[in-house]
Design a protein with these regions (language model features):
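Sec-dependent signal peptide recognition
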Residues: 2-9
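Cell-envelope and extracellular/periplasmic
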Residues: 20-240
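Intrinsically disordered, low-complexity Ser/Thr/Pro-rich regulatory regions
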Residues: 2, 18-19
Length: 240
């Protein structure tokens, strides 16, 4: 009994120490495949198991079928064309983030991003990397931090021949290169998540969207990679 009391005391003190240092903020955003992710299925349980429920804040805001210009305020096409209303979804996202962190001390910030399908279809790969950096710069400025970790969900193997989405493989490569180039970045593989049965019970194979089980695994992979980065470990997509 005494040993149990000591163990409980140690666990309590550990959690109290985490709380004193601040909350771990996880921001999830993107288009439809982020929209299909239910954080409560695997992402939240994974990060709460690692850091404690009381030390975690998770904010998700996604919108299906949208290009990256709706998050990046200064987006321009390769021809220099601007987009009216650029960044409106980022503003919506930050509205949720600011409400969630009001009065909280934030220890770490992790950004999970699943997007790129629309830009692949519209052939905007030439400005995709700059747009990713632009979003991270916006987050850094708005949150007053230079230590934001990020995890990118790489586009799946849906259109490896670039038939329907001409820049599909180009954006896949950009996502990998962008994450690999940063000590605070990681990417997760989604090639095995779009087969099986979707949430409506329909059989799918190499689909644009993920299976019901695929979304659960996707959330877990994002969480595992986020945790590793918080601990200062550089992870690869193979670390599933």
């Amino acid at each position: 009994m005494k040993q149990l009391q000591i163990l409980l005391a140690v666990l309590f003190l550990s959690n109290a120490a985490f709380a004193a240092e601040g909350q771990h903020l996880f921001i999830l955003s993107g288009q439809s495949n982020m929209g299909g992710l239910k954080p409560e299925e695997s992402f939240i349980p994974t990060v709460e198991k690692e850091f404690g429920k009381e030390n975690v804040i998770v904010v998700k805001d996604a919108h299906g079928g949208q290009p990256i210009r709706r998050w990046y305020k200064k987006w321009k096409s390769a021809k220099g064309e601007a987009f009216k209303g650029a960044g409106d979804l980022y503003v919506r996202l930050m509205g949720k983030v600011n409400a969630a962190i009001k009065g909280q001390k934030i220890q770490t910030v992790s950004f999970s991003w699943m997007q790129g399908e629309r830009d692949a279809r519209e052939k905007h790969s030439a400005v995709y990397a700059a747009s990713l950096q632009g979003i991270l710069d916006q987050l850094a400025a708005d949150l007053g931090r230079k230590d934001i970790n990020f995890v990118i969900g790489r586009l799946s193997d849906f259109d490896m021949q670039n038939k329907r989405y001409p820049h599909w493989t180009a954006i896949r490569k950009i996502q990998v290169d962008f994450a690999d180039a940063s000590p605070r970045g990681a990417w997760v593989d989604t090639d095995d998540l779009n087969d099986g049965k979707n949430r409506r019970g329909k059989d799918i194979s190499n689909d644009l969207h993920y299976s019901a089980k695929g979304y659960v695994e996707f959330g877990r992979r994002l969480a595992v990679s986020s945790i590793a980065l918080i601990k200062g470990k550089k992870v690869s997509a193979g670390d599933k």
